[in-house]
């Protein structure tokens, strides 16, 4: 593989609408193969390096199982027990690791770190999560919506809660896929406009009242109030976010057939009530499973390009 052919997936804007249409189609195909116990090994003998600076359940399991199901295998690497955690330059680690594997997934804190790694990698790099963006999760959410309701283009998504990596990724997705995002965050926790492209302005609207943000929504989504790395702010956040709990009353402002999503782990009684996340509008378990399927399609696409079957 030459440098000219390498594609990375570091944030949602790395793919075009046409790329997403293809990847979502492939996701459905790969999920059907999985459900039918059909052996499919297009990535036979390929190796995925998984580098974790942030702990994970869903990210590790979905990538490790996914590459295995495609015929490859995974190597787990933690910064706690590699030279990355002992001060080796990111650029040097990227040069070495990318000469020994076929594709790399990184889950870390700063987006700048994964960008520097990708700039020095000889193989595709996937963002498994950073403080700024979480593209694999939003891609899974969009596929989940597609499964249950059809294309998301022209629909309305409501975000209630923190201005975190999920929200910034949803804003990018709205611009590329053509849906409307209505968002509400507490005072003092507004968007960091350095992470928002001016071109995305027509695709999102900010509301002070979370109930107002949910009006007419086809999908309501949220996340934890205190993300990893912000634990010191937890007490202050519990007070600031108290009115941003997605409950049955808030869901009542959305369309009657609106879905509810949460990327998990969830804290019932904080960002969402048990009645909502465990209720009939919730699709969080399908959403969690779909991380597996979209990431399989993503790895297949980055390594093999567009397939004709």
Swiss-Prot record:
This is Ornithine carbamoyltransferase. It catalyses: carbamoyl phosphate + L-ornithine = L-citrulline + phosphate + H(+). PANTHER family: ORNITHINE CARBAMOYLTRANSFERASE, MITOCHONDRIAL, ORNITHINE TRANSCARBAMYLASE, MITOCHONDRIAL. It holds the Pfam family OTCace. Carbamoyl phosphate binds at residues 56-59, 83, 107, 134-137, 263-264, 291. Reversibly catalyzes the transfer of the carbamoyl group from carbamoyl phosphate (CP) to the N(epsilon) atom of ornithine (ORN) to produce L-citrulline. Pathway: Amino-acid biosynthesis; L-arginine biosynthesis; L-arginine from L-ornithine and carbamoyl phosphate: step 1/3. Belongs to the aspartate/ornithine carbamoyltransferase superfamily. OTCase family. Keywords: Amino-acid biosynthesis, Arginine biosynthesis, Cytoplasm, Transferase. It comes from Burkholderia lata (strain ATCC 17760 / DSM 23089 / LMG 22485 / NCIMB 9086 / R18194 / 383). It is found in: Cytoplasm. Gene3D superfamilies: Aspartate/ornithine carbamoyltransferase. One of its GO terms (biological process) is arginine biosynthetic process via ornithine. It comes from the Bacteria. L-ornithine binds at residues 165, 223, 227-228. The keyword Transferase applies. NCBIfam families: orni_carb_tr (TIGR00658), PRK00779.1 (NF001986). Its EC number is 2.1.3.3.
């Amino acid at each position: 593989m030459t440098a000219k052919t390498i594609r990375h997936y570091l944030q949602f804007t790395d793919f075009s609408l046409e790329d997403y249409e293809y990847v979502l189609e492939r996701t459905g195909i790969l999920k059907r193969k999985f459900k039918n116990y059909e052996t499919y090994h297009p990535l036979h003998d390929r190796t995925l390096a998984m580098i974790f600076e942030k702990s994970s359940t869903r990210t590790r399991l979905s990538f490790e199982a996914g590459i295995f199901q495609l015929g490859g295998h995974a190597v787990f690497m933690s910064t706690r027990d590699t030279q990355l955690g002992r001060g080796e330059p990111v650029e040097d680690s990227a040069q070495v690791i990318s000469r020994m594997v076929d594709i790399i997934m990184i889950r870390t804190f700063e987006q700048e770190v994964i960008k520097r790694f990708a700039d020095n990698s000889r193989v595709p790099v996937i963002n498994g999560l950073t403080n700024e963006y979480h593209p694999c999760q939003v891609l899974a959410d969009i596929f989940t919506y597609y499964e249950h309701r059809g294309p998301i283009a022209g629909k309305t998504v409501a975000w209630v809660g923190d201005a975190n990596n999920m929200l910034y990724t949803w804003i990018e997705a709205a611009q590329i896929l053509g849906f409307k995002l209505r968002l509400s965050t507490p005072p003092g926790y507004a968007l960091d406009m350095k992470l928002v492209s001016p071109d995305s302005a027509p695709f999102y609207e900010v509301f002070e009242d979370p109930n107002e943000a949910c009006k007419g929504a086809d999908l309501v989504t949220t996340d934890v109030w205190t993300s990893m790395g912000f634990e010191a702010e937890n007490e202050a956040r519990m007070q600031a976010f108290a009115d941003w709990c997605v409950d049955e009353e808030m869901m009542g402002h959305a369309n009657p057939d609106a879905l509810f999503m949460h990327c998990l782990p969830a804290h019932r009684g904080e960002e969402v009530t048990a009645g909502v996340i465990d209720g009939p509008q919730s699709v969080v378990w399908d959403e969690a499973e779909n991380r597996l399927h979209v990431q399989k399609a993503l790895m297949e696409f980055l390594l093999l390009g567009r397939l004709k079957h």
